[in-house]
């Protein structure tokens, strides 16, 4: 039978960094609240959560990378909101942030979770920050817990 690896959803003993974009703060603050709530409800101690605010979503990957350079975190959550406007700016920002977040995770070997809302309208973004479509910050935190535990299991099995 094949050996199966899965991460569990127990946050006790894990440390998290969270990078939050200040642009659209009325939305990103809800993402941060959802993420912190999920982490704490899953057993992460409040003093094991550190938050860094950045001006906008484009700056998220750099600060996530700098946080991981400190070797203090089991995962970093990246939270922001990019809303489509009348120019191609949305495509550039959304694409580069997603690539940057993925690159940081691949380069460091530490889970870096993409919790950035990309939406066509502000209404869609608000819904995904906790009204009708759940809270993407909460979802990012749960993914972070699972991935941090999975990486630990993979490392301990070698």
UniProtKB/Swiss-Prot annotation:
<feature type="active site" description="Proton donor">
    <location>
        <position position="89"/>
    </location>
</feature>
<dbReference type="InterPro" id="IPR034964">
    <property type="entry name" value="LS"/>
</dbReference>
<dbReference type="GO" id="GO:0009231">
    <property type="term" value="P:riboflavin biosynthetic process"/>
</dbReference>
<dbReference type="GO" id="GO:0005829">
    <property type="term" value="C:cytosol"/>
</dbReference>
<dbReference type="InterPro" id="IPR002180">
    <property type="entry name" value="LS/RS"/>
</dbReference>
<comment type="pathway">
    <text>Cofactor biosynthesis; riboflavin biosynthesis; riboflavin from 2-hydroxy-3-oxobutyl phosphate and 5-amino-6-(D-ribitylamino)uracil: step 1/2.</text>
</comment>
<feature type="binding site">
    <location>
        <begin position="86"/>
        <end position="87"/>
    </location>
    <ligand>
        <name>(2S)-2-hydroxy-3-oxobutyl phosphate</name>
    </ligand>
</feature>
<dbReference type="GO" id="GO:0009349">
    <property type="term" value="C:riboflavin synthase complex"/>
</dbReference>
<feature type="binding site">
    <location>
        <position position="23"/>
    </location>
    <ligand>
        <name>5-amino-6-(D-ribitylamino)uracil</name>
    </ligand>
</feature>
<comment type="similarity">
    <text>Belongs to the DMRL synthase family.</text>
</comment>
<feature type="binding site">
    <location>
        <begin position="57"/>
        <end position="59"/>
    </location>
    <ligand>
        <name>5-amino-6-(D-ribitylamino)uracil</name>
    </ligand>
</feature>
<dbReference type="GO" id="GO:0000906">
    <property type="term" value="F:6,7-dimethyl-8-ribityllumazine synthase activity"/>
</dbReference>
<feature type="binding site">
    <location>
        <position position="114"/>
    </location>
    <ligand>
        <name>5-amino-6-(D-ribitylamino)uracil</name>
    </ligand>
</feature>
<keyword id="KW-0686">Riboflavin biosynthesis</keyword>
<dbReference type="Pfam" id="PF00885">
    <property type="entry name" value="DMRL_synthase"/>
</dbReference>
<keyword id="KW-0808">Transferase</keyword>
<feature type="binding site">
    <location>
        <position position="128"/>
    </location>
    <ligand>
        <name>(2S)-2-hydroxy-3-oxobutyl phosphate</name>
    </ligand>
</feature>
<feature type="binding site">
    <location>
        <begin position="81"/>
        <end position="83"/>
    </location>
    <ligand>
        <name>5-amino-6-(D-ribitylamino)uracil</name>
    </ligand>
</feature>
<protein>
    <recommendedName>
        <fullName>6,7-dimethyl-8-ribityllumazine synthase</fullName>
        <ecNumber>2.5.1.78</ecNumber>
    </recommendedName>
</protein>
<dbReference type="InterPro" id="IPR036467">
    <property type="entry name" value="LS/RS_sf"/>
</dbReference>
<comment type="function">
    <text>Catalyzes the formation of 6,7-dimethyl-8-ribityllumazine by condensation of 5-amino-6-(D-ribitylamino)uracil with 3,4-dihydroxy-2-butanone 4-phosphate. This is the penultimate step in the biosynthesis of riboflavin.</text>
</comment>
